[in-house]
Amino acid sequence: TAVISDMFKKAFHIKSKKVETSLIEQFYYPKFGPGQLWEQTAADFEKMGGHLLMRHNVEKINVRDGRVLSVVCSTESGDKTIEGDIFISSMPVKDLIADISGEEAPQKIREIAAGLPYRDFITAGLLVDRLNLKNTTNIKTLGNIVPDCWIYVQEPDVKMGRIQIFNNWSPYMVEDPEHTVWIGLEYFCNEGDDMWNMSDEEFVNFASGELVKMGIIDSGSVKASHRERVKKAYPAYFDTYAEMDKVVDYLNSVDNLYCVGRNGQHRYNNMDHSMATAFRAVEHIMGVGGVTREDIWKVNTDKEYHEMQAEQNAATAD
């Protein structure tokens, strides 16, 4: 509905006060992709004296007297116990509650957390010679490819959900953006299902076959590929989610524990709002602006729709 409305408004030059994030035409994007943001963040953190521990998988969270005392992590060299004053968690709520030890969460809270649902995700990156989609717009692009950054797939006879065109996100992510196109194919699935269990070769053949079926690429045009599985990519709002407020109340009762991010709050927020939850958490810890623990959980909850935002004045100028 929003897509159709957007098309009509553009056709009749109607300005909208609000615009969906997925329909915004201008945005900031790191030169080498979102990973560059976190690489720079990590570098700045270490420059400020922070110690970043990689490949540490949290196995146990030790709680006593309403406070987290330490976490036990499995590493390549064995288990390691890490103590701290404040703990900020972005791990899935389901796993967080299950890992709490010593002073366990109440049985009801454990049951709610265990029942929280998720949708898992697979993406396949394909480097292709060209796309058969034509650029029929007045927007100039390298190689004159279609100007879209992402395309939602509506065909009922394919399983693909969305196509990313990385040349248009940032041409610096593609070695030869004038003669090749790097695309990302997105699929929604469940961990352990047939699609999830495909080998990389099987999945790439399947995904590229769907592109050929839709006429987007020609058979044999794939020059390179990469596939990634992402567990718990999409927190879902059914099953025990109706009682999520009880889990939030319990987590807020753990004095030095803060939950942030999409999985940390079991909320289908975009990247911007997910980062904002961390900002609110730090503001509360630092005692800035009167931010409460409840405010950390309220980021983006007062919107009409989770990806709706007020259109900035600069963006409305023709």
Predicted stretch roles:
Residues 51-53, 223-226, 258:
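General small-molecule cofactor/ligand-binding pocket signal
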Residues 228-231, 238-318:
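C-terminal lid/capping helical subdomain adjacent to the catalytic/cofactor pocket in oxidative enzymes
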Residues 30, 54-215, 243, 250, ...:
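Mid-domain catalytic core of redox enzymes
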Residues 1-64, 69, 83:
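Active-site/ligand-binding neighborhood in enzyme catalytic cores
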